[in-house]
Amino acid sequence: MADVKELPFGGSTPLFGGSTGGLLRKAQIEEKYLIVWNSKEEQVFEMPTGGAATMVAGTNVLYLARKEQCHALHRQLVSTFKIRDSKIYRVYPNGEQVLIFPMDGVPSEKSNPGREVVGYVPRKIGDNPNPVDVKFTGKETFDV
């Protein structure tokens, strides 16, 4: 389970004339999600729920109903605006906030000395074994 942390409030919500996809009544009894990021200037961005909003200069705080919406907005902030400091929190009805992305403080696309390597095979693709030579040996091609 991720560490429980206080949210960096003091920011404001982006300027948006529509809705955020409805926090649904379930959010009051289950959970909702929060994405927090810093912007150097006001910029227009696409909301994951449809429409466009203007992020404020400084800290932006936006509640959304689904985790996927927060991840979609995070990807947009990274690719379009080069904003890499966004954090996603799960907010429970009792007010408890849990950081869910990035869990260890480093986004998953970055290298981290403490992070375990998954799915790494130390060879070039041309050095892969011929699948016919591995067939019926009981081993997988990535284990050879």
Curated annotation (Swiss-Prot):
PsaD can form complexes with ferredoxin and ferredoxin-oxidoreductase in photosystem I (PS I) reaction center. This is Photosystem I reaction center subunit II. GO terms for cellular component: photosystem I reaction center; plasma membrane. It is a peripheral membrane protein. It is found in: Cell inner membrane. Belongs to the PsaD family. It comes from Gloeobacter violaceus (strain ATCC 29082 / PCC 7421). Keywords: Cell inner membrane, Cell membrane, Membrane, Photosynthesis, Photosystem I.
